[in-house]
C-alpha cells in the first residue's frame, strides 16, 4: 500500500476544541488542515466559560499564543483573598443554615472565566483564513476505496464534497461524526436529557452590588434542596454571570434545547430559598433556560482514520467546569501525536494512541460531573448538605482533574504510538487493524 507524504486532516466543527486542535496541527508543516463549520462564521453560544489550571496549562503547551488568547480576556474573582478560590460553597436553603459556609475549594488558578465569543475571536486570529470553510453541515462520510487517494469523502448539506486522509469530529454534543463512528442506532450515538435544567442570565455589576454587596465580587455557589445558584463576575468585573440549576425535571420536549423563559418561572423554581440566592434570582431579566444533556459513554473515540474529540466524544454536564478543558486536553494529545505523523499510514496509530490515553479520563469527568450536581442539590444520599461531610468529600476531590501531569500524558501517548508503529512495521506482510480498545467506563468514588 502506498501512503501519501502529505496528510490532509479535516476538522469538523470550529468551536474552542476544533480551533485549539487546528492551532496545534498547523505546527506540523506536513499536514494540510481544513476546518468545516456549519455556521456562517465562527461563533460560540453562551456567556462565560471557565478553564481550570489543567486546561490553561494544556493551552500553553499547544501554543503560548493560544494561552494568551484566554489570558487577555479572562476574569477572576475581584477580591485578593479569592485569588485561589474556585468556589465558596454556601448553604442556599432558607432557615437557620441560610448562608452557612460548606467549604472553600481552592486550586492554583482560582475561578477564571472568559466570554466564549471573545475567546473564540482571539483563537480565530491564529488560524489562516483559507483553511476555514463555513456553511458546511456534514451529512455523510464515505470511505474512498481508490488507492493512493484521500481515504474519506465528506458530503455536506449544501451539495459540496471534500476529501481527507483523516477526519476529526469536533462538532459538539449533536455530532454527525459520532453518529458515523458508532452507528445511528447505537444508544450512545445521540445525547440524553439528564433531568436537569439551568437558567442563565446576566446582571450589571453595579445592580448586583446594590442588592447583594460583596457577594457579587467573587465566585459563590449557593446549594440547596433540588438545585443551586452559581454566581461569578465576567467581563473584567463589569457583569455578574448567574446560573440557576434544578435537577428535578423529569422530561424535556425538544429540540430546541435552549429557549427563553419568563422570569416568574425561574422565581417559582427558587421560591423559599435563602436571602442571597433569592435576591439574585429576583434580579434576572430575560433569562434563558437550557436543557442539560450528556452522552452515554462511547466504547471508543476512533475507527479507522476517523475520530471524535471534545463534546462530540464525551459531552459532560457543566458542574465541574471541565468540558472545554477536556476538549483542549484532547487537542493537546492529538496535536502532540500528529507532530509524528509523516505519512498517511501513521494516522491510524496516532488515533489509536489518542483513544487509549484519553478515554478513561474523559469519561470519569462525565461521571463525576453528574455526581457533583447531586452534591450541590443535597440529594446524593450521603452528604445531603451536611457541612462536615461536605468538607470530607470535597477535600482533594478535584485534584485528579486539576493536577493532571499533562506532559506525562503526552509521553504516554507518544510511547503507545511508537509501540503500535513498531508492531505495524514488524508485520509488513499483513497490515494489522488497530481497532478501538473498549476500556471500562470510569465511575465516581465520591
UniProtKB/Swiss-Prot annotation:
InterPro entries: FAD-bd, FAD/NAD-bd_sf, FAD_monoxygenase. Pathway: Secondary metabolite biosynthesis. The keyword Zinc-finger does not apply. Glycans are attached at residue 107. Its cofactor is FAD. FAD binds at residues 37, 50, 116, 311, 324. It is found in: Membrane. Its main location: membrane. Terreic acid is a metabolite with antibiotic properties. Terreic acid also acts as a selective inhibitor of human BTK kinase in mast cells and other immune cells. GO terms for molecular function: FAD binding; monooxygenase activity. It catalyses: 6-methylsalicylate + AH2 + O2 + H(+) = 3-methylcatechol + A + CO2 + H2O. It comes from the Eukaryota. Belongs to the paxM FAD-dependent monooxygenase family. This is 6-methylsalicylate 1-monooxygenase atA.
Amino acid at each position: 500500500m502506498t501512503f501519501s507524504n502529505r496528510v490532509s486532516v479535516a476538522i469538523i466543527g470550529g468551536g474552542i476544541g476544533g480551533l485549539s486542535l487546528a492551532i496545534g496541527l498547523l505546527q506540523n508543516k506536513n499536514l494540510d488542515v481544513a476546518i468545516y463549520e456549519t455556521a456562517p462564521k465562527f461563533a460560540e453560544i453562551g456567556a462565560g466559560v471557565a478553564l481550570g489550571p489543567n486546561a490553561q496549562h494544556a493551552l500553553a503547551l499547544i501554543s503560548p499564543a493560544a494561552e494568551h488568547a484566554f489570558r487577555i480576556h479572562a476574569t477572576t474573582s475581584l477580591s485578593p483573598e479569592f485569588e485561589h478560590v474556585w468556589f465558596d460553597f454556601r448553604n442556599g436553603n432558607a432557615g437557620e443554615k441560610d448562608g452557612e459556609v460548606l467549604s472553600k475549594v481552592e486550586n492554583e488558578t482560582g475561578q477564571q472565566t472568559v466570554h466564549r465569543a471573545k475567546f473564540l475571536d482571539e483563537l480565530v486570529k491564529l488560524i489562516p483564513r483559507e483553511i476555514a470553510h463555513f456553511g458546511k453541515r456534514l451529512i455523510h462520510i464515505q470511505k474512498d476505496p481508490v488507492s493512493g487517494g484521500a481515504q474519506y469523502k465528506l458530503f455536506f448539506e449544501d451539495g459540496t464534497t471534500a476529501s481527507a486522509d483523516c477526519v476529526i469530529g469536533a462538532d459538539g454534543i449533536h455530532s454527525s461524526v459520532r453518529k458515523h463512528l458508532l452507528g445511528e442506532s447505537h444508544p450512545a450515538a445521540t445525547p440524553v436529557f439528564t433531568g436537569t435544567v439551568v437558567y442563565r442570565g446576566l446582571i450589571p455589576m453595579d445592580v448586583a452590588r446594590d442588592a447583594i454587596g460583596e457577594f457579587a465580587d467573587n465566585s459563590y455557589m449557593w446549594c440547596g434542596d433540588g438545585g443551586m445558584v452559581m454566581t461569578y463576575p465576567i467581563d473584567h468585573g463589569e457583569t455578574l454571570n448567574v446560573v440557576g440549576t434544578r435537577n428535578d425535571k423529569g422530561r424535556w420536549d425538544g429540540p430546541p434545547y435552549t429557549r427563553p423563559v419568563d422570569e416568574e418561572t425561574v422565581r417559582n423554581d427558587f421560591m423559599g430559598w435563602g436571602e442571597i440566592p433569592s435576591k439574585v434570582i429576583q434580579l434576572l431579566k430575560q433569562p434563558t433556560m437550557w436543557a442539560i444533556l450528556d452522552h452515554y459513554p462511547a466504547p471508543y473515540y476512533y475507527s479507522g482514520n476517523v475520530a471524535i474529540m471534545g463534546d462530540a466524544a464525551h459531552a459532560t454536564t457543566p458542574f465541574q467546569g471541565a468540558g472545554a478543558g477536556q476538549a483542549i486536553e484532547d487537542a493537546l494529545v492529538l496535536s502532540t501525536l500528529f507532530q509524528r505523523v509523516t505519512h498517511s499510514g501513521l494516522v491510524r496509530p496516532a488515533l489509536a494512541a489518542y483513544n487509549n490515553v484519553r478515554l478513561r479520563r474523559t469519561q470519569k469527568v462525565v461521571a463525576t460531573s453528574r455526581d457533583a450536581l447531586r452534591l450541590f442539590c443535597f440529594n446524593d444520599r450521603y452528604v445531603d448538605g451536611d457541612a462536615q461531610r461536605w468538607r470530607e468529600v470535597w477535600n482533594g476531590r478535584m485534584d485528579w482533574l486539576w493536577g493532571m501531569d499533562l506532559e506525562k500524558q503526552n509521553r504516554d501517548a507518544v510511547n503507545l504510538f511508537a509501540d503500535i508503529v513498531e508492531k505495524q512495521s514488524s508485520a509488513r506482510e499483513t497490515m494489522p487493524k488497530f481497532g478501538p480498545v473498549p476500556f471500562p467506563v470510569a465511575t465516581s468514588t465520591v
